[in-house]
A protein has these predicted regions:
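Low-complexity, acidic/polar, glycine-enriched regions of mature
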Residues: 14-186
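Sec-dependent signal peptide recognition
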Residues: 1-4
């Protein structure tokens, strides 16, 4: 009986590719960007995300597909949120979504350490690779299904995506990406 329960509730799937649905209540693409040429850092996040992760542990492959709703951009400051959504910056009326598609690569000890992919932001698509700083799968204690989580890091130049606000005033264009994601087995 105990063996049957262990098999039934084993949180790891080793035999075939498994699809995980991104949990929007536990996934936050966050970023840090320069304010006024080094005066301070502004931090923000995207509050509304959706997508899937496919993980094939046996063959050490996988993919990521994430959609971010730019209306949900949040700096924790109403005026900055308004500015970020305007046509000066993200122009969310013209570009309501950003997306990221990538491949999980460089598996070590059974887990991926990098995502090689493309970010589409502000209508422009560029190669953006993400480093996976932490990755773990386990049995979700409430849903009794496998859940995987990761902490990812990367960097972009926002002017590469046509977002040049502040450049003429000396604002630095580099943006640090800090992404926390959790996804539940489908």
């Amino acid at each position: 009986m105990m063996v049957a329960l262990l098999v039934l509730f084993t949180p790891f799937s080793f035999g075939k590719p498994v699809t995980y649905v991104i949990d929007p209540s536990h996934t936050f693409p966050a970023f840090e960007a320069d304010h006024m040429g080094g005066l301070s850092l502004w931090r923000g996040k995207i509050n509304s995300t959706s997508g899937e992760i496919i993980l094939d542990k046996k063959n050490k492959t996988g993919s990521v597909n994430v959609v971010m709703e730019m209306l949900s951009i949040d700096f924790g400051h109403d005026e900055m949120n308004k500015r970020a959504k305007s046509d000066d910056m993200f122009d969310i009326e013209e570009f309501p979504q950003a997306s990221y598609e990538g491949k999980l690569i460089n598996f070590q000890d059974g887990v991926p350490t990098k995502v090689e992919g493309e970010l589409t932001l502000h209508g422009i698509t560029k190669n953006v690779d993400l480093e996976i700083k932490a990755f773990k799968c386990r049995l979700h204690p409430f849903k009794l299904r496998e859940v995987c989580g990761a902490d990812l890091r990367g960097n972009i130049m926002r002017d590469d995506f046509g977002i040049k606000y502040g450049k003429m005033l000396g604002f630095k264009m580099g943006v640090a990406l800090r992404i926390g994601v959790e996804a539940i087995k489908k």
